From Swiss-Prot:
Species of provenance: Treponema pallidum (strain Nichols)
Catalysed reaction, written as an equation: D-alanyl-D-alanine + UDP-N-acetyl-alpha-D-muramoyl-L-alanyl-gamma-D-glutamyl-meso-2,6-diaminopimelate + ATP = UDP-N-acetyl-alpha-D-muramoyl-L-alanyl-gamma-D-glutamyl-meso-2,6-diaminopimeloyl-D-alanyl-D-alanine + ADP + phosphate + H(+)
Protein's name according to its UniProt entry: UDP-N-acetylmuramoyl-tripeptide--D-alanyl-D-alanine ligase
Pathway assigned to this chain's UniProt record: Cell wall biogenesis; peptidoglycan biosynthesis
Function as written in the Swiss-Prot or TrEMBL entry: Involved in cell wall formation. Catalyzes the final step in the synthesis of UDP-N-acetylmuramoyl-pentapeptide, the precursor of murein.
Length: 459
């Protein structure tokens, strides 16, 4: 049993409208009626297009032993009747989303010995989480965010995976609106927190990069005097380091207790010198070397010895759609989970230092850039035009507009709208040659992983 109904009422300041027959608590939490299993607590959430209250009856039919309901909901009486019929508990709350968050926070506090680590940043959150999971698993029993459940709904969902045997919890904190990071920090209350970078992701929502930095900094808002934050050595270092409680470690090459040398080895990754040991980072790119520096700094603060840090780092696997290198008839780098101007520039920088007979770049639109989208896509096109790629393929309306504003010289350029995936596949298939190196980079919304079967084809 995760929590008793008495604990739920205390945590969410709810009123129990009716009791469950034969159950004192619940074993799991779900807000998706399709995923409900017996003995779940169902929490109906209101979205922009769908109201979870519509699915309360379905959740009860599938075996949910309790449901929360919004006490302001006009048909609350119907749900009480359903709960009575199915023998489930019904708890009325003022707001079901806030109740989910309060319940997750309450549940997390039941494990005071758990070392809580929070990770945020414009990019690199999931990669840093996976690096940290691998490193800390050398010594501790670790629980970590499944996938990228890092939002105001996803973080609470992640916290319910914590169990008594876990010693370290590593959680992503993402945001796409002002004020969300403080809410997430209040839910988790991290002992340690990493900011991977302050880029231009979400600039379309927050307006400026400075506003993004201010929002990311909120991950430190619940710090005590014993908490430790980690920030990169960049233009926002001083701003991010100025916090009222706790202390901040700046991670980068050099510095006391940190890596003293980094060697970029292209698609094979990089090597980092730490306490006399060369640690291999198996993910390509300088940006991933920086991600590794953050994790090394974190692990050193927690007290892991260098040999455990090395063993863990060297067994890191790339998360889905991130820095995934495949060597077949072609060599290709699949980095299609997320894209913003900074990660695009990092990918193109990586490719510039790769030795290949011929290079082909496939670039998909970057999302959530607002009024800066046109300029951002134009700048990426300028970088691509100056590269040594044989051909550049762009996919999406923003890049289709941007390519027309750039001088490409003798470089072949192909532009495809989102509804022209088949045409992109056919043209790419006809042009690729055995031995080519192909970069595939775009936002999640354009789903460029659909090109992978084509890229694996024997040539």
């Amino acid at each position: 049993m995760l929590l008793s109904f008495d604990e739920v009422c205390a945590a969410v300041q709810g009123a129990r409208v009716c009791d469950a027959r034969g159950a004192r608590g619940f074993d799991g939490v779900s807000f998706d009626s399709r995923a409900v299993v017996p003995r779940d607590l169902f929490i109906p959430l209101r979205g922009a297009h769908v109201d979870g209250h519509t699915f309360v009856e379905e959740a009860l039919q599938k075996g949910a032993v309790a449901t929360l309901i919004d006490q302001r909901y006009p048909h609350a009486g119907e749900y009480v009747a359903w709960c009575t019929r199915f023998g489930a508990a019904c708890i009325a709350v003022h707001d079901t989303l806030r109740a989910l968050q309060d319940l997750a926070s309450f549940y997390c506090k039941k494990f005071p010995a758990l070392i809580r680590i929070g990770i945020t940043g414009s990019s690199g959150k999931t990669t840093v989480k996976e690096m940290a999971r691998a490193v800390f698993s050398e010594r501790y029993r670790v629980v970590a965010t499944p996938g990228n459940l890092n939002s105001e709904i996803g973080l609470p969902q992640s916290l319910f995976f914590v169990r008594a045997e876990h010693e370290v919890g590593i959680f992503e904190l993402g945001m796409n609106r002002r004020g969300e990071m403080r809410t997430l920090a209040q839910i988790l209350v991290p002992h340690y927190a990493i900011i991977t970078n302050v880029g231009c992701a979400h600039v379309g929502i927050l307006g400026t990069q400075q506003a993004i930095a201010e929002e990311k900094k909120e991950i430190f808002s619940q710090f005590t005097e014993h908490s430790v934050g980690f920030v990169p050595d960049d233009a926002y270092r001083v701003f991010l380091s100025n916090i009222p409680y706790g202390r901040v470690v700046v991670y980068d090459q050099g510095g006391r207790g940190l890596a003293t040398e980094v060697i970029d080895e292209g698609l094979r990754g990089s090597r980092v010198l730490y306490q006399g040991r060369w640690i291999r980072v198996p993910l390509p790119g300088v940006h991933n070397a920086k991600n590794a520096l953050a994790v090394i700094a974190l692990a050193a603060q927690v007290g892991l010895p260098a040999e455990e840090i090395q063993r863990g780092m060297e067994r890191v696997k790339p998360p889905f759609g991130r820095s995934h290198v495949v060597c077949a008839s072609l060599t290709f780098l699949l980095d299609c989970y997320n894209a913003n101007p900074d990660s695009m520039a990092a990918a193109l920088h990586l490719c510039a230092h790769i030795s290949a007979v011929s290079k082909v770049y496939v670039l998909g639109d970057m999302g959530e850039l607002g009024v800066t989208a046109a300029e951002a896509h134009y700048r990426v096109c300028v970088l691509a035009a100056a590269s040594d790629a044989r051909a550049v393929y762009v996919f999406g309306p923003e890049f289709c507009r941007a390519v027309r504003k750039v001088s490409w010289g003798r470089k072949r350029v192909y532009a495809f709208a989102l509804e022209e995936l088949s045409a992109l596949q056919e043209t790419l298939d006809a042009q690729l040659r055995r031995g080519d190196f192909v970069l595939v980079k775009g936002s999640r919304s354009v789903a460029l992983e659909r090109l992978e079967p084509l890229l694996r084809k024997e040539r």
